[in-house]
Amino acid sequence: MGHTHSRQLFVHMLSVMLKHRGITVSKTKLINFLSFIEEVCPWFPREGTVNLETWKKVGEQIRTHYTLHGPEKVPVETLSFWTLIRDCLDFDNDELKRLGNLLKQEEDPLHTPDSVPSYDPPPPPPPSLKMHPSDNDDSLSSTDEAELDEEAAKYHQEDWGFLAQEKGALTSKDELVECFKNLTIALQNAGIQLPSNNNTFPSAPPFPPAYTPTVMAGLDPPPGFPPPSKHMSPLQKALRQAQRLGEVVSDFSLAFPVFENNNQRYYESLPFKQLKELKIACSQYGPTAPFTIAMIESLGTQALPPNDWKQTARACLSGGDYLLWKSEFFEQCARIADVNRQQGIQTSYEMLIGEGPYQATDTQLNFLPGAYAQISNAARQAWKKLPSSSTKTEDLSKVRQGPDEPYQDFVARLLDTIGKIMSDEKAGMVLAKQLAFENANSACQAALRPYRKKGDLSDFIRICADIGPSYMQGIAMAAALQGKSIKEVLFQQQARNKKGLQKSGNSGCFVCGQPGHRAAVCPQKHQTSVNTPNLCPRCKKGKHWARDCRSKTDVQGNPLPPVSGNWVRGQPLAPKQCYGATLQVPKEPLQTSVEPQEAARDWTSVPPPIQY
């Protein structure tokens, strides 16, 4: 059987089944019997469920085990237990035997008219079990004693009659119908009246619930009788279910009165999730927000009694708002009651407000269907007349776009929150456009900044449609390659988009090729170019300037003249004219002789120029 729990359960079921047939067997013997079956038949069902076919296979396996190992390996009571359980599982034969007994009883007269009816004696035992009349002498003759010993020796050599199934003549359906008719006629002749289906009998107490097998085996305690069903309103049913599921229903604590079982109507419970969302909407968005009003309209389609509306309003509204709603609700009910009085409708003011003789909830459950529609209409109209709560906008600041969230999803969340708070569509769109830019992430803000005052919300969504995680990775890689921050890269793209450089087909500088500036303002354009020296013209040996050449010979080995320190003369100056007294030196050829030179001549005076 596997587990101990399943073994005990199966033993208990076998014990009950055998006891039903008048056979008492101890549980110890049944446990030993099942242990032997587990040893012989390892495939025996572990779930403890058997039928007649399975039990026959068990018998064949026991027979094989007996043939191979002999009678010493088979307990004595195994054959008896197997036969008894086989008879319990063979339901068809049991029913046929009962029908046969009924047929036999039908053939005998039930009673005589002049005598008191008496019970028939039990049917005689089958011929195989009939005992011979006992003699006074209990001793057996030698012949009978020898025959008994011979039969006992052949006991284990028989072909196991317990495996053979009795095959009696099956009773057809027509025979059973005919038998039932004969029994009915016999009962009528005997003066016994059969109960008619039209007679009404007092209702019997409900049967106890069907116990599970574990309870029947004594492993689990039996469950108690179910409490009598109570008719509750839809709100009270919803709160019952929520309390069983572990929800906190402290705000609806007045929803569990005692009821009488005198109502035959059928009621459905409200989903507690709807009530919970209504309370959250009233606390976050206000009682007159569009989202809250939509939930009240949905709740108004249910047939709620007045006490349910009062309890819902008390739990969802503040103290002041509840008093305002209650006074407005009573006023609406008074108007409806006046109209009902004029139209001859039997729905009074006390019924609509649930006061006076209609204060109990079980009494309110017996109203006419039209009364619930009027009560719901009055409750909805009173709810709509509560003061608006336009100051509940603190949650809008929490609606921000995540770093990897698509922009369209962020705008959808923003519009949903604004729609629950503001009823004016135009004002809501203006606020949505403002928050769609301010609460967006840095990448979307950089893309939307040039179009902040030009485009609308649809343009914002179209511009930021491609901005996602891959876009942010590209911006980060560009910033790393250029050695700039992400903010500088975004500003650079914004400036490029603003100047329209993308339309020119080249977004970089024509001089240096770097993005971010034009060729006119390129910083590399005004830098002085540094020329590198070529082959030296003096020595023809290396690349250096001639003024830096220090070679003595040229490339062919010819000696080079020495380089003076200032052989590179500068740019010749223009001749200067000195006005005033000048010393005129005669132009004479250079004399290389050693003769003494002539003395210098005297100074001469020259008139000043006309103009300076």
Curated annotation (Swiss-Prot):
Residues 103-148, 589-612 are annotated as: Disordered. Residues 119-128 have a biased composition (Pro residues). A zinc finger (CCHC-type) spans 507-524, 534-551. Changing residue 214 to S: In strain: JSRV-21. One of its GO terms (biological process) is viral budding via host ESCRT complex. Transmembrane segments: none annotated. Keywords: Capsid protein, Coiled coil, Host-virus interaction, Lipoprotein, Metal-binding, Myristate, Phosphoprotein, Repeat, Viral budding, Viral budding via the host ESCRT complexes, Viral matrix protein, Viral nucleoprotein, Viral release from host cell, Virion, Zinc, Zinc-finger. A motif (PPXY motif) lies at residues 208-211. A lipid is attached at residue 2 (N-myristoyl glycine). This is Gag polyprotein. It comes from Sheep pulmonary adenomatosis virus (Jaagsiekte sheep retrovirus). The gene is gag.
